[in-house]
Amino acid sequence: MGGLHQGHQQLIRRAAEPRSGAEPACIVSVFVNPLQFGRGEDFDRYPRDLDRDRDLAAEAGAQALFAPSLEAMFPQGEAEITRIRPPTSLADRLCGHSRPGHFEGVATIVCRLLTLVKPQRLVMGEKDWQQLVILRRVVADLGLAVTLEGCATVRGLDSLACSSRNRYLSEAEAATATALPQALAQAALDSRSDPGAEGLAAAVRARLEASGLRPDYVELVRAHNLTPLQRVEGLTLLAAAAYCGPSRLIDHVFLMSRAPIVAIDGPAGAGKSTATRALAHRLGLLYLDTGAMYRALTWWVREQGVDPADAAAIAPLLQDLDLRLLGGVDGEQQVLINGHDVSTAIRSPEVTALVSIVAAHGCVR
């Protein structure tokens, strides 16, 4: 909607990245959408500085700025435009509870912009995660010919999420506003010992109020569909909105009920195992040597005297195979096949020469 900042510039840089050797044309839309503002909200004072927006967009790699007039967006007037209503299960909770009609206004104008511009890709920020989830659903349900990509939230040095509305904040209010990301970050730590929604939300509210912020909501939901949760389950979103003076701030943090999975890939001999083992040790994760698994299966195929290129002959060998990797977080893993330690045998030159052939078979993968 204009009022461009560092977060918008990151979106533009992402959109302008070369794809398949070609440099895409990056178009930035600027339109302060009246449909997504409720009565008494800040439509009239929302930041508008098209010259500054143009300069920031060009600096980040945009080739064009699309800033349509109200007449261009609403040829028959605002009241006559066809509205897009997202599912209430997505639009009426979190921010939608206190801003009725907001996401209908967002979806309507985004669809209108997509119709006018016809882009191949649409890049949007994750700061308003609910908006991103809703628009993904709208794009999917309407079969729109565009790929919607999310881009991680950009934050200032004070951890406050970049927002056009941050310029409403006085110096003192800006300092107070940092309590929101700080409270969510602390909740992420607390969730490891107490993953319950009630306790996490109450703790965040207490920290916000103690800092002088007025909470609007603090809720724990499933990240992909915004379904309310009673405790952290899988990929979970802890979302919050709070008022700092007259300004409404939103933020969120992702929580998980298990440790994350980190995969490192690269060419043979590049040091993947060394780097992955070190990373697992630093982060307290379990190191899983998938390369050793492929080597073990290759060793087994050789032991059975089967042609490494014959997938049909290999498949039966895997039916009752017992393959185990044993070891600690940072130690070398012991590889067992049917109870036999093959940790050393799988590193032989003979096995190494055949791994890529065996690993290419679907039954092995």
Residue ranges and their predicted role:
Residues 272:
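Conserved lysine of the Walker
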Residues 280-290, 303-307:
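Post-Walker A helix-loop "phosphate-sensing" segment adjacent to the P-loop in P-loop NTPases
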Residues 232-235, 244-261:
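Extreme N-terminal, non-catalytic leader segments
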Residues 293-365:
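ATP-dependent small-molecule kinase phosphotransfer cores
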Residues 264:
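Hydrophobic anchor at the beta1->P-loop junction of P-loop NTPases
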Residues 269:
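Walker A (P-loop) phosphate-binding loop of P-loop NTPases
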Residues 11, 275, 279:
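Hydrophobic positions on the alpha1 helix immediately C-terminal to the Walker A/P-loop
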Residues 1-225, 253, 339:
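Nucleotidyltransferase catalytic core that binds NTPs
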